[in-house]
Amino acid sequence: MRFIVIGAGRVGLRTARVLREEGHDVTLVERDTDRADRGRSDGFSVVEGDGSREDVLAKAAV
């Protein structure tokens, strides 16, 4: 299954890791560059931007 996690802070990254461990495809949406980079370094696909904006969600293929 494919999941989009909005926010790559402590809770968002933990959620993404658990989902990935369960075999799911996970994309993170994050507006903070440092957090986005952290998600990428953990091997996640990351879309940078505000997760409440429709254009950003479209980039994440929602």
Could you describe each region identified by the protein language model?
Residues 1-62:
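Cytosolic regulatory regions of ion transport systems
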